[in-house]
Amino acid sequence: MDYTPRLQPARLIKRYKRFLADVVTPEGETLTLHCANTGAMTGCATPGDTVWYSTSDNPKRKYPQSWELTETQQNHWICVNTLRANTLLYEALLENRIEELAGYSDIKTEVKYGTENSRIDLLLQAPDRIDCYIEVKSVTLLQHECGYFPDAVTLRGQKHLRELQQMVSNGKRAVLFFAVLHSGIQQVSPARHIDSRYAELFIEAQQAGVEILCYGSTLCPDGIKLTNKLPLLG
């Protein structure tokens, strides 16, 4: 996924009200950015970090600039815009870069499914294959050399695990796809220390046949791309 035009840098002053962040540009201008990340953003929003932002040409937006990347003071790159994960996987599927998900001729997005009023991120279909339901999660929390999901208690994430497990029970294929959008993360684990119920449901879903895939990425102000498969820790 290319950033066009290229992202612009600023220094983070603070993030507040979950969806807003104040930054100062190299020219000394203070801007308020929109933040599309509803999580805790632990380690992704330290004052003094370099923020890379995009600018929308939509005149109706109150905050035209969006926080896309963080370049931390430890020299890690992080995509904090969680909306990008779905786009990255969609592009990778079109280019047949995810071996485990190759061979499908049709990709649908935001399709209603399940019994808890859910929408699946991606639905893969082909005449000779079982429908494949994919839920995409962005992983940005780095602790003790491991990436964890979630970074805060997530009732929505718990619901998605139940829905995926139900799809397997219905004879479908179900995949939980972790898009690792932090350059320092080399392995992934469910965050039992943050959301113990999510971790329990994760194990239940995995044992029921829900597939877990973890892929790393390359990140820079020109663009981001899913790259290599990463190991999953139990």
Swiss-Prot record:
GO molecular function: DNA binding
HAMAP family reported for this sequence: SfsA
PANTHER family (UniProt xref): SUGAR FERMENTATION STIMULATION PROTEIN A (PTHR30545:SF2)
Family the UniProt entry places it in: Belongs to the SfsA family.
The name this protein goes by in its record: Sugar fermentation stimulation protein homolog
Organism, as annotated: Pectobacterium atrosepticum (strain SCRI 1043 / ATCC BAA-672) (Erwinia carotovora subsp. atroseptica)
